[in-house]
Amino acid sequence: MFEFDAFHLARLQFAFTVSFHILFPAITIGLASYLVVLEGMWLRTRDNVWRSLYNFWLKIFAVNFGMGVVSGLVMSYQFGTNWSGFSQFAGSITGPLLLYEVLTAFFLEAGFLGVMLFGWNKVPPALHFFTTCMVALGTLVSTFWILASNSWMQTPQGFIIENGHLIPQDWLAIIFNPSFPYRLF
């Protein structure tokens, strides 16, 4: 019979959070690229059908982006509370990978998201298209770093264990580990 001790409850809670969270980035990644296509088609043809489609999907993108951020924060908080032992053991590798995701991707997305959402009639069309492209690029870069971290946890490479902690030795081996290519593509 299954016992609901602290360990199993933590796993159940994390499984729920991860299952809930993954819905939003998956939709956001696809929608960001789709929004680039829609706005590009509007720029090319000036047909307002493309602009209407863009505006419709932009609202859905914004809600998904916000929900992804909120559920992602909850998930990262659970890393520290539910899995603090793993964080202490592997934090020297997983920490920088998540930091790269925040610095290179999330700030890129968040920096341009405001103009993308509210700048349609306030900035020139080419600049607005650029912001949409930057948000889409940010989602792809974010995907890269998260998949690198997840792939490393599945097939760890490029480290040594010293005094009960992982010490990175080869960041290229850590990032481009054996399971990374098929997770990315």
Please state what every model-predicted region is.
Residues 1-185:
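Polytopic transmembrane helical bundles with strong interfacial aromatic enrichment
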